[in-house]
Amino acid sequence: MRINPTTSGPGVSTLEKKNLGRIAQIIGPVLDVAFPPGKMPNIYNALVVKGRDTVGQQINVTCEVQQLLGNNRVRAVAMSATDGLMRGMEVIDTGAPLSVPVGGATLGRIFNVLGEPVDNLGPVDTRTTSPIHRSAPAFIQLDTKLSIFETGIKVVDLLAPYRRGGKIGLFGGAGVGKTVLIMELINNIAKAHGGVSVFGGVGERTREGNDLYMEMKESGVINEKNISESKVALVYGQMNEPPGARMRVGLTALTMAEYFRDVNEQDVLLFIDNIFRFVQAGSEVSALLGRMPSAVGYQPTLSTEMGTLQERITSTKEGSITSIQAVYVPADDLTDPAPATTFAHLDATTVLSRGLAAKGIYPAVDPLDSTSTMLQPRIVGEEHYETAQRVKQTLQRYKELQDIIAILGLDELSEEDRLTVARARKIERFLSQPFFVAEVFTGSPGKYVGLAETIRGFQLILSGELDGLPEQAFYLVGNIDEATAKAMNLEMESKLKK
C-alpha cells in the first residue's frame, strides 16, 4: 500500500499527548525503552528523548524502534549521539515513522537524516512531510517500457546508455572527475528534462560534502541569490555520525525524490554516494542489535535491506527516479557481498579511468569498461548499436596495438592498422566534451549533444570521411560540425604562422 505524504509532522505540542516511556538501558547508540502495558510503539516508530544532561545542556535525541523485546520493552537505534542520556529519562513515542520535509522548498538546502536543515539558512518553508518508510510502487503503477535516459554526454549516451528509471553504478577513485560528472548530470536533467536532483551523501567525508556544496554554488547548480531556482536538494549523513543515521539517510533522500516523481510528476536523478556505506551502516546496526553475522561479517538481512531501498527507485506512470550510485569496492574485491549484492540491481556501470584523466580527456569515462544492459538493437535501434560496437572494436584494436607502438613505433604497423590507430585517436578525443559546470574553470562553453548528433559524429569518423582532419580538432568539442570548424581554424592559424 502506498502511503500518501502527510502534512506537517508531529510538533512538540502534539508529542506531549503521545505514549510516554522511560530509558531502561543504554549501550552506545542502542536504547532499551520500557513503556506502560498495552502502549507499545510499532516497529520503525520514531521515539524522541528530550531533557537535560548533568551540566544542564538541552538534549534532543530521535531514535527508531527496531525490536520489540517483550516485557513491555523495545530496542531502538539513535539517529544522533547518545551523550548525556541517562536511565530513567522520559521517552516520547511519536506514533509514526520519521517524517521529512518534501517538495520544491527542499531545493538548494542541506538536510540531515531527520530532515532538519543544517546549512544555517533558517527553517524550510514547507508544511508537507512524508514518512521515510514506504512500500515500493505496486507493479501495476510501474512504467515497464524500456527507454533511454538521454544525458547529453556523448560517451555515456553512445556506449553505456542510462535507462530511464534505472540504476547506474559509478566507479572511480579520487580525482578522476566524479564530482564534476555528477554536477553536469544534475545540470543537464534540469535543462533538458525539466527535472530535479536529490543528492544523498551516505557515510562519506564531511569535507567532501562541504566541497560539493561549494562547487555547486560556484557552478550555479545551487542558486544562492534565488534558492528556489536551485536544481538539487542535498541530504547528508556523514561518516562521523552514528550507524542509525548513516543507515537511514539514503531513505530520507529517496523519500524527497519520490515526492518529485509521484506528486510533481517529474523526472528525478537520485545520487547515492556511497552505496557501500549504506550496507556498512546496516552491518553495524545489525551487530549492535545482536543478530548473528552472515558471510564476511555482514548482516544476515543484507539482500532484503538492499532490495527495500532499490525497489523504490523506479519509473512509474507519473515520472521516474533514475539513480546513480557511487560504489566503493573494498580491497578491489568484486566478490565481496556488499558490491556483489549491489551489482544485481544495476542496469549500467560508468567506470572512470585514471589513464584517461591523465591524458586530459574529460569526462574520463572508460569506453571499454563501462557497460549497459540497454545497449541492445531491440532497445536502442540497429544504427546506434552498430555504431557503438564499431567504436568499441576500433578502441579495442588500438589498445591491443599500443605495446607494439611503444616498442617499434607507428611505422612498423600495417597500413590498415595505422588507419585504425588514427581513427581510434580521433574517437578517443571526440569522446571528450566541454561541460557546463566546468565553464568557470576552463573558460570554454559547455555543450549538450543530442543522441542523434552523437551517432552521426561517430559514423563520420568511422566511415573515413574525416581522416584528413588533425586529431586535436576533435578534442573538447560538442558535435562533429564543431570539430570540422575547429579543424579549419587550426589550418588558418598554421597558415598565418607561416
Swiss-Prot record:
Top-level taxonomic group: Eukaryota
UniProt keyword Thylakoid present: yes
Reactions catalysed: ATP + H2O + 4 H(+)(in) = ADP + phosphate + 5 H(+)(out)
Main location: plastid
Enzyme Commission number(s) of this protein: 7.1.2.2
A Pfam family recorded for this sequence: ATP-synt_ab
Keyword Transcription regulation: no
Membrane topology type: Peripheral membrane protein
Top EC class of this enzyme: translocase
Subunit structure: F-type ATPases have 2 components, CF(1) - the catalytic core - and CF(0) - the membrane proton channel. CF(1) has five subunits: alpha(3), beta(3), gamma(1), delta(1), epsilon(1). CF(0) has four main subunits: a(1), b(1), b'(1) and c(9-12).
PANTHER family, per database record: ATP SYNTHASE (PTHR15184), ATP SYNTHASE SUBUNIT BETA, MITOCHONDRIAL (PTHR15184:SF71)
Protein name: ATP synthase subunit beta, chloroplastic
Protein encoded by which gene: atpB
